[in-house]
Amino acid sequence: STILNIVKGDTLLLQRTVPYGTNAVVTEVMDEKGVDATTAMTLLQNERLVTVDFDDNAATGAFRYLINNVGRVIDYYVAKNPDKPIDDVFLTGDGALIRGIDGLFKIQLNIQTKIMDSLYNVKFDPKIDLKIYNPVYLISPIGAAFAPMGFRPSEVKSKTGGNTEYAKYCAAAMG
């Protein structure tokens, strides 16, 4: 599934879960190429199998439900908040590493789309292999460590002293 967050500054305006993700396109490539899931994802990341039009090929068409559902969430948000337009879409996670996904989102949703493949002002230890630990996977945990949203049961908060110590712990655990 895919989690959509609409954020302005440091305020979460809307969060929705869409029950579609990269599974459909990975399955399509597996069937078409006769490969396993890992190889299919590698092909999607290294070859331009995804274009900007759903009708170009089956792999691109497999994103139709995901993008249509994202579009519905965006339409809902815009209808409820006409004074707060969405300027950009930022992609993270496995799907963000698929070549051409940003162009597909941009054309189909008519919104500027960017892949969050780097973290500004974050320096990694040179020993960390960024090909394995790609920054697109680290955005959520790093964000949660620096600015937790407070989604923790009260009994856990009382044992740890609140969110501040939790944020320090997460930041320390990430190294």
Functional labels for PLM-detected ranges:
Residues 1-175:
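Hydrophobic/aromatic-enriched cytosolic interaction surfaces used to assemble or bind macromolecules
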